[in-house]
């Protein structure tokens, strides 16, 4: 179903069954598969493939040569009905690839709202991306990677499969991430390691002075106290009773499976 207010260039192919909502603009030479749904006011520039079971929200901008919802690169994939979900207000720049999920990973690759994926970003199967993230040119995420809100990943960085990246993290360009990165941290290198806190980012996002001081204390517990991760977790839980923001560290350490960068 194509809404009457949608604009579709005559050179584009939209298979029967696709749902195109109001004021969507599909530019020239695009292909949209039968199981795709595209939300209102989303713009597809040109030469874009959207395939598989793919749901795209409202007010997204998708640039030329992007490929969304294609078969993933997991050799175990056997044509199961897995999918991708993309939220609202995302900018997906040239040649970005986002692959559908696998049955082993929850069946969905999921993108939140208001993210910017620059040229040639690759988001593999089963990745879960939060809101307000920025991934610079040529960032590559392996399968099952989770990236929390307000994370910035520098260009040419690769993130190993199953890694977890916390909220408000900044990763420098050309890094190789092989372990989990706790929230609020600046990381860089191959293999990536911690280089302090993303203080400037926290200030820009309105964190109070007391919250920033508490986060500094949490960083010292995690990285300068010679505690084990479990020992640090106990100390962080105690600190969180006075400063609830520290629960982000506690929750992250609970979720972490690959160990944290240290």
UniProtKB/Swiss-Prot annotation:
EC number from the UniProt entry: 2.3.1.129
Residues in coiled coil: none
Pathway(s) per entry: Glycolipid biosynthesis; lipid IV(A) biosynthesis; lipid IV(A) from (3R)-3-hydroxytetradecanoyl-[acyl-carrier-protein] and UDP-N-acetyl-alpha-D-glucosamine: step 1/6
InterPro entries: Acetyltransf_C, Acetyltransf_C_sf, Hexapep, Hexapep_transf_CS, Lipid_A_LpxA, Trimer_LpxA-like_sf
Localization annotation: Cytoplasm
Subunit structure: Homotrimer.
Family, per entry: Belongs to the transferase hexapeptide repeat family. LpxA subfamily.
Protein name: Acyl-[acyl-carrier-protein]--UDP-N-acetylglucosamine O-acyltransferase
Natural source organism: Blochmanniella floridana
Gene encoding the protein: lpxA
């Amino acid at each position: 179903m194509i809404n009457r207010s949608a604009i579709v260039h005559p050179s584009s192919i939209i298979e029967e069954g696709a749902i195109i909502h109001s004021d969507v603009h599909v530019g020239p030479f695009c292909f949209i598969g039968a199981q795709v749904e595209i939300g209102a006011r989303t713009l597809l520039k040109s030469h874009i493939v959207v395939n598989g079971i793919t749901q795209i929200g409202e007010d997204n901008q998708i640039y030329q040569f992007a490929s969304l919802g294609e078969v993933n690169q997991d050799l175990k994939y056997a044509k199961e009905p897995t999918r991708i979900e993309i939220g609202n207000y995302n900018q997906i720049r040239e040649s970005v690839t986002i692959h559908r999920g696998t049955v082993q990973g929850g069946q969905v690759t999921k993108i939140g709202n208001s993210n910017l994926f620059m040229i040639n970003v690759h988001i593999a199967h089963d990745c879960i991306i939060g809101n307000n993230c920025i991934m610079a040119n040529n960032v590559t995420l392996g399968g099952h990677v989770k990236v929390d809100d307000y994370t910035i990943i520098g260009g040419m960085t690769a993130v190993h499969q199953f890694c977890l990246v916390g909220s408000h993290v900044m990763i420098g360009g050309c890094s190789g991430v092989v372990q989990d990165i706790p929230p609020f941290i600046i990381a860089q290198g191959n293999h990536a390691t911690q280089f302090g806190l993303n203080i400037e980012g926290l200030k820009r996002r309105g964190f109070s002075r007391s919250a920033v001081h508490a986060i500094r204390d949490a960083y010292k517990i995690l990285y300068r106290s010679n505690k084990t991760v479990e020992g640090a977790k106990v100390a962080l839980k105690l600190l969180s009773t006075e400063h609830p923001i520290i629960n982000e560290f506690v929750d992250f350490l609970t979720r972490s499976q690959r160990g944290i960068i240290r």
